[in-house]
Amino acid sequence: MLGFDLGRTGYEDAFTLQKQVQAMVQSGGDDILLLLEHPPTVSIGKNSGAENVPPHLQDMWNGHVDIVHSTRGGNVTCHFPGQLVAYPVISLKKRSGGIRAYVHDLEEAAIRMLARFGVTAARRQGFPGVWTGERKIASLGIAVSRYVTMHGMALNVAEDLSLFNIISPCGLEGVAATSIARETAGPVPDMPAVKTAFLEEFYHIFQPAGDHAQPLPTLRTTQDLMTLLQDAQRTEK
């Protein structure tokens, strides 16, 4: 399993990279976890949610927010700097339990990571994502093609959740968003620390049992990912 830190990447650019990585994993490549932040973006999932987007949203944000229609499942959500976005691109062929088990384990990685920073989180019956009480701290929306996942999870880290003042999390009226900064009694971790913690918890859950003797992975760079994709393309030729 390989992990990559893509820094701040636009939604459409990240989607293009995911599709390239997905094709590589479908061809037998290593499972990959992409960690990043998006600029202010409202994404509308396959379950719609367009009705939950104010018609003058871009005017309200002076044009500084992108609105995109996504291939992921779920309703409407938003992304912004200070939110960890995790896009696992992994094969489910050798994992038992199918998509439901995958979603459960992805939530579990977030719950364990949050515990490291003093935030008690859990699942909420009947509602996807990760919650602290009745406040939503992480949203999920995935897609699967030929047994390989893409899209994933958005987990709020920073204090500023102002975009959620306009967009209800996953279209759920009356649901408040929260973040690590709002829930922790200790110092707020920086994004590199959050990314590293999530990578480690994700690895412990998703790495095949026989590979746990291997050292924990470290986050590689966007350039490392581009080199990997170029090498894969040359191999195919």
Curated annotation (Swiss-Prot):
Which PROSITE patterns has this protein been placed in?
BPL_LPL_CATALYTIC, LIPB
Pfam families for this protein: LplA-B_cat (PF21948)
The record's SUPFAM superfamilies line, in alphabetical order, gives: Class II aaRS and biotin synthetases
Could you say which residues bind substrate here?
72-79, 139-141, 152-154
Q: Which domain of life is it from?
A: Bacteria
User: In the Enzyme Commission scheme, what number(s) does this protein have?
Assistant: 2.3.1.181
Q: Mostly located where?
A: cytoplasm
Pathway(s) it belongs to? Protein modification; protein lipoylation via endogenous pathway; protein N(6)-(lipoyl)lysine from octanoyl-[acyl-carrier-protein]: step 1/2
Q: Give the gene symbol.
A: lipB
Q: Kindly list the residue ranges recorded as spanning the membrane.
A: none
PANTHER family attached to this UniProt entry: LIPOYLTRANSFERASE 2, MITOCHONDRIAL-RELATED, OCTANOYLTRANSFERASE
Q: Does the keyword Signal apply?
A: no
The miscellaneous remark of the record is: In the reaction, the free carboxyl group of octanoic acid is attached via an amide linkage to the epsilon-amino group of a specific lysine residue of lipoyl domains of lipoate-dependent enzymes.
Task: Output this protein's name.
Answer: Octanoyltransferase
Its family? Answer: Belongs to the LipB family.
Q: Which locations, inside or outside the cell, does it occupy?
A: Cytoplasm
One GO cellular component term:
cytoplasm
Catalysed reactions listed for this entry? octanoyl-[ACP] + L-lysyl-[protein] = N(6)-octanoyl-L-lysyl-[protein] + holo-[ACP] + H(+)
Q: What does this protein do?
A: Catalyzes the transfer of endogenously produced octanoic acid from octanoyl-acyl-carrier-protein onto the lipoyl domains of lipoate-dependent enzymes. Lipoyl-ACP can also act as a substrate although octanoyl-ACP is likely to be the physiological substrate.
Q: Which organism is it from?
A: Desulfovibrio desulfuricans (strain ATCC 27774 / DSM 6949 / MB)
Q: Which residues form the BPL/LPL catalytic domain?
A: 27-210
